[in-house]
Each structure stands twice: as C-alpha cells, then as structure tokens.
C-alpha cells in the first residue's frame, strides 16, 4: 500500500519524474536509510547488547583492526548475523526496476550505495559499494580478495563463534579482514 502524500509532495514527485525522464544519465546515491526499512540498524542507531559499550571507531576502522582484530571480527560476525535474514524492501525493488527498464531506453541509471549490505543486489540492481561489502573479505596486508562468505551460514545463531582463530592469507600470511573501509 502506498503512503498518502500531500498535494504539495505529489506535485514535487511529478516534477521530479518529468525532469528525470528527459535525462540520459542518472546517478542515485543511497545510504543507511534505505536498508533501515528492511530492519538493518544504522551506524547512528545505538549499538545493542554486547556492543553497546563500544563506539564505531572502536570497531569499524583500520586502526581498530590493527589493535584488536578478534574484537573487530566478532563485531562483523555479529553484523553479518543481523543482516543475513534481511530482504529488500519496496525502495530496493523500485530502484532495481528503474535500472532494468532503463536498459530498453536511452537512460543509464547508475546506483551507488554507502551501505555494506547486499539488499540492492538481492533486488536485482547493479550497484557500486563505496564502503565495501559485508560478505567479502580481503587480506589486511597484501589486499588480495578472500573467497566470499555465504550469508546462509549466518541465519542460525548457533553457527557464529566469536572465538574463532583468525584466518591468514594463503599468499602472505597477513590477517584476513572484512572488505569494508
């Protein structure tokens, strides 16, 4: 069901649609708000449970990984578990449809996201991730990508062990880290 909009907002939407219809290249930037509707917490939301005593800078920076890689890995394992069962919402699907239909017109719709989840891809979009991707890993030393993680392994709570031994790179023995900046 569509939300009821005021006449002023409807007029703005119609104007935007008219202006965008005549453009050949459109670039859309999305952020946390689009995935929040699917139940994914944003960085502005208060951390919950085990993580409420940590700031983002304690968990989501290269310095944090250098200081305490097991803590950072534990947090990312938790984040993966939070995201694993989430599905795209109508906004994700609308953008995917827009991209799909643009292929048969003279429009190019480029989608860029600040999000690290894969909800745009699940909806069918081609997307560029500015800050990395939650399901990819890479070596902290030589930057070689490590095989992608399966989201299905994270759906059951008992599949996550926070005390797992750190994975080392087969090329240089550096630690594997989440591919997120």
For the regions a protein language model found, what residue spans apply to each?
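Conserved catalytic core of sirtuin-type NAD+-dependent deacylases
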Residues: 1-181
């Amino acid at each position: 069901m569509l939300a009821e909009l005021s006449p002023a907002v409807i007029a703005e939407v119609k104007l935007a649609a008219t202006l965008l219809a005549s453009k050949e290249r459109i670039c859309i930037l999305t952020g946390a708000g689009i995935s929040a509707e699917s139940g994914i917490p944003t960085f502005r939301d208060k951390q919950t449970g085990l993580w409420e005593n940590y700031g983002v800078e304690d968990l989501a920076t290269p310095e944090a990984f250098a200081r305490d890689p097991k803590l950072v890995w534990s947090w990312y394992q938790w984040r993966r578990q939070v995201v694993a069962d989430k599905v795209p919402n109508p906004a994700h699907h609308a953008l995917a449809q827009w991209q799909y239909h643009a292929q048969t017109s003279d429009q190019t719709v480029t989608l860029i996201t600040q999000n690290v989840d894969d909800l745009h891809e699940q909806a069918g979009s081609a997307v560029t991730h500015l800050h990395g991707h939650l399901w990819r890993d890479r070596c902290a030393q030589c930057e070689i990508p490590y095989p992608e993680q399966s989201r299905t392994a994270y759906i059951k709570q008992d599949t996550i062990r926070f005390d797992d031994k750190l994975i080392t790179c087969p090329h240089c023995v550096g630690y594997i880290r989440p591919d997120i900046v």
